[in-house]
Amino acid sequence: MAKKRAGNRETESSPLVEQEPRPSKETPVPKGAQSPGGASARMSILLLVVIFACSACVMYLVFRNFPQLSEDEREKIKIPKDMEDAKALGTVLSKYKDTYYTQVLLAYFATYIFLQTFAIPGSIFLSILSGYLYPFPLALFLVCLCSGLGASFCYMLSYLVGRPMVYKYLTERAQKWSQQVDKHREHLINYIIFLRITPFLPNWFINITSPVINVPLGVFFLGTFLGVAPPSFVAINAGTTLYKLTTAGEAVSWNSLLVLGVLAVVSILPVCFQKKLQQKLE
């Protein structure tokens, strides 16, 4: 009898051993939750550090080809953290801009893209600085191009190594934004432009979650290039009076905020009109 009971226990317990674990309904696993190659969050961080180190080496080479600077000038060549740093940097760059035009432009271009790619604060000061260093049309094109390229590089970086981190630390926010993107899938460029003009979502969040929720790279770049133009217009215009500013907040006036609000509404109007037209036709 004892043997028979033992046999029954083994037969009853065996299906439990062989049964495959099912994912919990409370924490659904997102589609494609693993990055290519099934890299873990730890491996992704390691790859990110390696890519950052390589990019920093490129930045070092760019600034190594900079003209010979005095000791005092060398101390001012750094990523601006406040308006005083931006003024000091503007003084040095304006001195060498005419003689070493290509080197200064390349250094500005590379630095802006570097900051955008790795979501490092400071690009707002470079936008203001462009208005001080260059003619307005060139400054606006330069800032829009750098923002578009830098954000696209951040997008690709997130696509390659950032997915595990997004799923681990930003799952809930990414899922909420994914639902919003699905609602505007037919008018995604207008939606990206609207988000870039308005402060509803941080730019770094848009950059790193867009590849995870399947925003196409082409749409992402174009929406960013066009969407950053209005805020950049304000910053560049403020750069013409750089030395009168004491903080970055002074670059934005009530008039400029009103203009940005109007442009944000204009960017989303075609979507509203098309939806109303579709409702009437139906």
Swiss-Prot record:
Biological role stated in the UniProt entry: Phospholipid scramblase involved in lipid homeostasis and membrane dynamics processes. Has phospholipid scramblase activity toward cholesterol and phosphatidylserine, as well as phosphatidylethanolamine and phosphatidylcholine. Required for autophagosome formation: participates in early stages of autophagosome biogenesis at the endoplasmic reticulum (ER) membrane by reequilibrating the leaflets of the ER as lipids are extracted by atg2 (atg2a or atg2b) to mediate autophagosome assembly.
CC per GO annotation: endoplasmic reticulum membrane; mitochondria-associated endoplasmic reticulum membrane contact site
Presence of the UniProt keyword Transport in the record: yes
Annotated knockout phenotype: Morpholino knockdown of the protein causes severe defects in motor neuron axonal outgrowth.
Catalytic activity: a 1,2-diacyl-sn-glycero-3-phospho-L-serine(in) = a 1,2-diacyl-sn-glycero-3-phospho-L-serine(out); cholesterol(in) = cholesterol(out); a 1,2-diacyl-sn-glycero-3-phosphocholine(in) = a 1,2-diacyl-sn-glycero-3-phosphocholine(out); a 1,2-diacyl-sn-glycero-3-phosphoethanolamine(in) = a 1,2-diacyl-sn-glycero-3-phosphoethanolamine(out)
Keyword field: Autophagy, Endoplasmic reticulum, Lipid transport, Membrane, Neurogenesis, Transmembrane, Transmembrane helix, Transport
Region (Disordered) location: 1-36
Gene: tmem41b
Transmembrane segments: 43-63, 102-122, 138-160, 188-208, 216-236, 251-271
Keyword Nucleus attached: no
VTT domain as annotated region, ranges: 131-242
Family classification: Belongs to the TMEM41 family.
Organism classification: Eukaryota, Metazoa, Chordata, Craniata, Vertebrata
Membrane topology: Multi-pass membrane protein
Protein name, as recorded: Transmembrane protein 41B
An annotated Gene Ontology molecular function: phospholipid scramblase activity
